[in-house]
Amino acid sequence: MSDSNIVVSQTSIKVISNLIKGLKKDYEPYVKDTVPLVIAKLRDRKLEADCCACLDNLLESVSIEDILDEILAGLNDKGPAGRKCTAAFLEKAILVTYIDVLTRVAPSYLAQLVKNADDTNSECRDAALGALGAFKGRFGESYMSKYLSELNP
């Protein structure tokens, strides 16, 4: 997957994506190794769609609580595509995650999403605001008010 040849990298990401889709929960032991590599490959524009699809397939294998550090690293990635796609993945994950799990991980994710909402890249900003909106939809206005008050109007 760390090959410099685009075709080789793209094929390996598609293979991993299909493995995740097929194995579902059985792929969980390998997720912590996979996520940072996929996020790193997001820096290449030609691989962006395949990497995002690979991350989306992870929703069936792992909880966002288990990959908290990896997702936070993706939200801090130096490439805007990494930040954007990670925030979009997080938005989808928020909608399908049990509320008790979200309650445990929300402070970590929300602090970083508020920072990303002030990003210079408009796509990253929009993705972070989408994830914040998903959190607001799950938790309500009263819980989110302390985080949303930090945003610039």
Region roles according to the model:
Residues 1, 12-23, 38-41, 53-62, ...:
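Hydrophobic residues within the alpha-helices of tandem HEAT/HEAT-like
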